Swiss-Prot record:
SMART domains: B_lectin, PAN_AP, S_TKc. This is G-type lectin S-receptor-like serine/threonine-protein kinase At1g61430. It is a single-pass type I membrane protein. Residues 277-313 form the EGF-like domain. Residues 489-777 form the Protein kinase domain. It is an enzyme of class 2 (transferase). Residues 1-24 form the signal peptide.
Length: 806
């Protein structure tokens, strides 16, 4: 297979060092050495020796031949690298493939196979290294039966209960160490099967049961999702899982952080079509037994109806792993219909809990009846593509999606529903009495409302509009009250500029009712219209997280549009980081806490909120600080919501702040989660250095901030990049790690940047980091230039560019 072997004896030493041979196959007479490669006949895959992180250690592996950077999909000697340049792969006297480390012995082999003379090893068009017996033609050994961290199309994960065999993926220890890590991916022998990721001996993530074409625990696998997966089970106790290639190079990988990804190459980058776990609710058992994880509504863990926290104090602290217990014990008597009879309460949009049992039922009603008459059945679900599932154990690892998901019916004591009926009766009586009193004042109120109608018509119109947008609890403030509180927007009450306007504080920071507020007054010349104003109100009202700013309400009178926030005494992060005196208040531990807090807020926006929001204007001045210096992401006027499986969008109107905008967004209008990651990388480097991206200049060449960060990292001089005010409070290795994370975030290609879950993992663990590529998109303003000189860029003929200077 492949090209003929090149034999050119006079120059053999030169080519062994400086270029690779194309190799046809491995036989006993022609062993395979460092510097040689073996290609599949279709030219897609290649076998050879490679090193990681410029190390002297060599590994024998398979990779995509024409894709740069190199993507390794299988490693033979992942636990024991070779270090001798004389290392080779050959066929031993007993007929097995073995990898020897020169004079240092054997480091890897296929084991005793006893192949006949003339047998050979080849690389198939599917990326499978096979060892074929010449006489029988049988495949004696193949790499597809010894998986690493990657599943290729036509390779298989499987289990066989009779033979006691199971085959799954094992993550690398780190990006630069292919030895087995702590995560393993398997398919379970349950009926129906499901995929699980194990972290050591404990479950870390599961896909939910398989329903013919999809995993029920993945909301992105809705009816519109074209599943690449195939999972089959037979009556002999075996199961097989694989995925199909749809015309483009693809792979499924278990990362060293424990994330399963399906990646497809589009000719330029690897695009992710599936990821799990995708957010914090996907982590196994996060809410404990009978706990329900609802990622979009904090706190994310709740108890099912009829259940209460097992340990209330711990639950309030956010320690949910102990789960919930029944408020009313069951008194099951099979088919009882009396006052002690059990009932079922149905919850929609559910990821089916773990430890399910398949029950043979023809339809949902039969499934219901079978569970009702079985006292050990605690819940049931009838799922298209599966049928009837029942649960007799604790409901574990259950979450609720904002859309998609299954119906789960939970057995409760009838009294649990009767309590609600009594409450409804009391509420109805109270409402009736209240309405009677209200109508008694209606005549007087009608006259007064007519008098004030004109003054409030604008607010009422906006109130109606906002109510139609499902924005609950939003307060509408009177213009007179705001003008009085801010001394008619006097300069003495001005806190500073904000996105699309100025921000003011109330006198003494308070309204007459004692509340501390800040008022964002939108400028009529700012370019922010109804859409951006609505964006900010709707998004901030629906998003609730400790690292996001909280909006109290709004006020609209004529041309005036005001947003009312809770007042944060420490203003924005830039007033500390870039101020020679105030920066001393933020030592390195505090800055790192701020960095981590921003990342957690970003994770909520991208993965944990039901809206899935891309901020598009993440920068230091848009990070507010409360009295304890906790960061709050603000200014959502430019934010966009993503739906379903959408991962990117393209706009004709590129808006944002120069220097923080990713290359693909600035020049083509394409934005995604990775655009915010780029902005975070710039923000991170600014926090570390105490320097502005828009005005920093270093050396005679006038290097910009990203270029200087790259230079310091390459020369392991990260301490030079650090703000000197942090010299005594920082640790060099921690600073170096953060600089490297920042550089990973600002890589030119979106596919090279970490996603938000990976970013937070990098910040909160000490696992090895991948090596960043040199940033190629560098915006720089010389000190003798006004920032506005660089504030306008042309994206394309169809794009209106509105770039806001900091």
């Amino acid at each position: 297979m492949g090209k003929k072997r090149i034999v050119f004896f006079a120059y053999l030493p030169f080519f062994t060092i400086f270029m690779s041979f194309s190799f046809a196959g491995i036989t006993k007479e022609s062993p395979f050495s460092i510097g040689q490669t073996l290609s599949s006949s279709n030219g897609v895959y290649e076998l050879g020796f490679f090193s990681l992180n410029n190390s002297q250690n060599q590994y024998l592996g398979i990779w995509f031949k024409s894709i740069i950077p190199q993507v390794v999909v299988w490693v033979a000697n992942r636990e024991k690298p070779v270090t001798d340049s004389a290392a080779n792969l050959g066929i031993s006297s007993n007929g097995s493939l073995l990898l020897s480390n020169g004079k240092h012995g054997v480091v890897w082999s296929t084991g005793d196979i006893f192949a006949s003379n003339g047998s050979r090893a080849e690389l198939t068009d599917h990326g499978n290294l096979v060892f074929i017996d010449k006489v029988s033609g049988r495949t004696l050994w193949q790499s597809f039966e010894h998986l690493g961290n990657t599943l290729l199309p036509t390779s298989i994960m499987m289990y066989n209960l009779v033979a006691g065999e199971k085959r799954g993926l094992t993550a690398w220890k780190s990006y630069t160490d292919p030895s087995p890590g702590e995560f393993v991916a398997l398919i379970t022998p349950q009926v129906p099967s499901q995929g699980i990721i194990m972290r050591g001996s404990t479950r870390y993530y599961r896909t939910g049961p398989w329903a013919k074409t999809r995993f029920t625990g993945s909301p992105q696998m809705d009816e519109s999702y074209t599943s690449p997966f195939i999972l089959t089970q037979d009556v002999n106790g075996s199961g097989y899982f694989s995925f199909v290639e749809r015309g483009k190079p693809s792979r499924m990988i278990l990362t060293s952080e424990g994330t399963m990804k399906v990646l497809v190459h589009n000719g330029m980058d690897w695009e992710s079509t599936y990821e799990g776990p995708a957010n914090s609710c996907d982590i196994y058992g996060v809410c404990g037994p009978f706990g329900l994880c609802v990622v979009s509504i904090p706190p994310k863990c709740k108890c099912f109806k009829g259940f209460v926290p097992k340990f209330a104090k711990e639950w309030k602290k956010g320690n949910w792993t102990s789960g919930c217990v029944r408020r009313t014990e069951l008194h099951c008597q099979g088919n009882s219909s009396g006052k002690d009879a059990n009932v079922f309460y149905t919850v929609p949009n559910i990821k089916p809990p773990d430890f399910y049992e398949y029950a043979n039922s023809q339809n949902a009603e039969e499934c219901h009846q079978n569970c009702l008459h079985n006292c050990s059945c605690l819940a049931f679900s009838y799922i298209p593509g599966i049928g009837c599932l029942m649960w007799s154990k604790d409901l574990m690892d259950t979450r609720q999606f904002s859309a998609a998901g299954e119906l789960l019916s939970i057995r409760l004591a009838r009294s649990e529903l009767d309590v609600n009926k009594r409450k409804m009766t009391i509420v109805a009586s109270t409402v009736s009495l209240t309405l009677f009193v209200i109508f008694g004042f209606a005549a007087f109120g009608f006259w007064r409302c007519r008098v004030e109608h004109n003054a409030h018509i604008s607010n009422d119109a906006w109130r109606n509009f906002l109510q139609s947008q499902d924005v609950p609890g939003l307060e509408f403030f009177e213009m007179n009250a705001i003008q009085t509180a801010t001394n008619n927007f006097s300069l003495s009450n001005k806190l500073g500029p904000g996105g699309f306007g100025s921000v003011y504080k109330a006198r003494n920071g308070k309204l007459q009712d004692g509340r501390e507020i800040a008022v964002k007054r939108l400028s009529s010349s700012s370019g922010q219209g109804k859409q951006e104003f609505m964006n900010e109100i709707v998004l901030i009202s629906k998003l609730q997280h400790r690292n996001l700013v909280r909006v109290l309400g709004c006020c609209v009178e004529g041309t005036e549009k005001l947003l009312i926030y809770g007042f944060l005494k420490n203003k924005s992060l830039d007033t500390f980081v870039f101020d020679a005196r105030k920066k001393l208040e933020l030592d390195w531990p505090k800055r790192f806490e701020i960095i981590e807090g921003i990342a957690r807020g970003l994770l909520y926006l991208h993965r944990d909120s039901r809206l899935r929001v891309i901020h598009r204007d993440l920068k230091v001045s848009n990070i507010l600080l409360d009295e304890k210096m906790n960061p709050k992401i603000s200014d959502f006027g430019l934010a966009r919501m993503f739906q379903g499986t959408q991962y990117q969008e393209k706009t004709r109107r590129v808006v944002g702040t120069l220097g923080y905008m990713s290359p693909e967004y600035a020049w083509t209008g394409v934005f995604s989660e990775k655009s915010d990651i780029y902005s975070f990388g710039v923000l991170l480097l600014e926090i570390i250095s105490g320097k502005k991206i828009s005005s920093f200049s270093y050396g005679e060449e006038g290097k910009a901030l990203l270029a200087y960060a790259w230079e310091c990292w390459c020369e392991t001089r990260e301490v030079n990049f650090l703000d000197q005010a942090l010299a005594d409070s920082s640790h060099p290795s921690e600073v170096g790690r953060c600089v490297q994370i920042g550089l990973l975030c600002v890589q030119h290609e979106p596919a090279d940047r970490p996603n938000t879950l990976e970013l937070l993992s990098m910040l909160t663990t000490t696992s090895d980091l991948p090596l960043p590529k040199k940033p190629t998109f560098v915006v720089h303003t010389r000190k003798d230039e006004s920032p506005s000189n660089d504030s306008m860029i042309t994206v394309n003929e169809m794009t209106e560019s509105v770039i806001q200077g900091r």
